[in-house]
């Protein structure tokens, strides 16, 4: 850390005071440019702009979100952002104390795994995200001193909202719709081993003993870290947390593939159609004409060619690691046996 110029900040997060350090060069070369890009994107949209900051536990996302909020208030030409958290959508402590979750066929008290996706009220989160896109709303917070949710605390009123949380990009059932509310997504990745001590120390600051903190890490935090790293949708931008607490842009991180709903696109009167789009439209018209004339051999050949191209695309997505078999099944609405046949042909 000695080779870097560190700036010390004192921030209040979820009812607890935090003294944190950030590399000045990172502030200048990563954080401020990010805020300027978000400003430009919001101005182009002309409406409220919702940014997700998703990351595993222990990566410092809550303090980072608040720092970005503070920096936006000081930066010239930067739209002020408002940082809010996902933790306010935990179920209340009395609910968690009286309910359980199922793990590997066994029921486990929610209190033992607090922080996992099952301990959040996802339906309430969806309602709030829908409302915040177009109106000012009151936002709940999680108070770590009370270990409970406090409702309707913060009024969300800025044009750029930065929402931070572990599960914002989770691909699991019940959470998949959350992704669609975001205008921009940022993910912080890290080596799971680097987060262990950070998470244990956080629990100790919250009142646990060393043994209690280590036990909670093994049964809850560790699993949550692995789940976020393995089961999150790809983000539009990825930063990496270094062992010294600094952040760097991970420029080689894979980006999400933009899927186009072509049938919906055609219905928009203001769409500028490319030459490729016009060509596809003409081919479809020609196919209809051939079919009307009884010339189905051409149509059959065309269909076979398109099917072969589709198989190649699916194999490339799978072999490159850009999409898992589960993602291919859900995205392209394939039957498991059809996907298996496509992938087996690649090995043949």
Question: What are these model-predicted stretches?
Answer:
Residues 58:
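Walker A (P-loop) phosphate-binding loop of P-loop NTPases
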Residues 61:
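Conserved lysine of the Walker
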Residues 64:
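Hydrophobic positions on the alpha1 helix immediately C-terminal to the Walker A/P-loop
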Residues 82, 91-143:
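Conserved nucleotide-sensing/catalytic segment adjacent to the nucleotide-binding pocket
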Residues 146-202:
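ATP-dependent NMP and nucleoside kinases share a basic, alpha-helical "lid"
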Residues 259-348:
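Intrinsic-disorder/low-complexity detector
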